[in-house]
Amino acid sequence: MNKMNQLVRFVKDTVAVRKPQSEDKSYLPIPSTIGGHEVNSPFAEPTAPSLGIIQPKCKRADWLIKSHLTITTNYEIKEWETWDRAISDILDLYDGNPVFKPILLFVYYVLAYNARKIPGPSNGVRYGAYFDELTTVWHAIPELMNQEIDYSYNHRVLHRKIQYVISFKIQMSSTKRRTSPIESFIEVTSEGLKHTPQFTTILDRARFVYSLTGGRYVIHPF
């Protein structure tokens, strides 16, 4: 059997994306909460009214996202904290396009959050997740439209006697087909890992900048 077919697929949620009320359906106003807190600007910093700072618009991007994540270890991982210590290295080691960084790492954490045990080497344990979906992402990244991107991340790390081999691959291409919101793919928590927090808690620990409105994630620049 093809190795990729052994990876666990997400169950596709067919909930339609709510259409914005503005005339331009690719944009929404920035919500007034970021990370659950009230803010007066997109940077969560107080500013003088006389400065006339213009808040960036929230944009909709529709992509076909194909991505997979595999993590091979020499010991079974039992708690999220141990898992998170290894997967979070990418926050410092990411070497791709900086404009795409918030989106790519968001998908990376979705995969890490949904990873399952899959067949692997006889002398180790392998976890994996596979994503191949037509996806809507709302964001407030001015330079980002529906550009295509291809990124790979391969990393080895030793932490507390546990060896991790991490492989992450993602391809994103623009689509005009019917899509599902990215938040519909993050309902399931990691299998067998104790003390797995809510996904928003994981994003906060990784210092993501995002807002939530009506259950919709809006991804901001780092």
Curated annotation (Swiss-Prot):
Q: Which UniProt keywords apply?
A: Host membrane, Host nucleus, Host-virus interaction, Membrane, Viral budding, Viral budding via the host ESCRT complexes, Viral matrix protein, Viral release from host cell, Virion
Q: What does this protein do?
A: Plays a major role in assembly and budding of virion, by recruiting cellular partners of the ESCRT complexes that play a key role in releasing the budding particle from the host membrane. Condensates the ribonucleocapsid core during virus assembly.
Q: Name one Pfam family in it.
A: Vesiculo_matrix
> Mostly located where?
virion
Provide the domain comment: Late-budding domains (L domains) are short sequence motifs essential for viral particle budding. They recruit proteins of the host ESCRT machinery (Endosomal Sorting Complex Required for Transport) or ESCRT-associated proteins. M contains a PTAP/PSAP motif, which interacts with the UEV domain of TSG101.
Q: Which GO terms describe its biological process?
A: viral budding via host ESCRT complex
| Keyword set includes Membrane | yes
Protein name listed in UniProt: Matrix protein
Record's bilayer topology term:
Peripheral membrane protein
Where is the protein found, in the record's own terms? Virion membrane; Host endomembrane system; Host nucleus membrane
- The UniProt gene name for this protein comes to M
Q: Which organism is it from?
A: Drosophila melanogaster sigma virus (isolate Drosophila/USA/AP30/2005)
MF terms in GO: structural constituent of virion
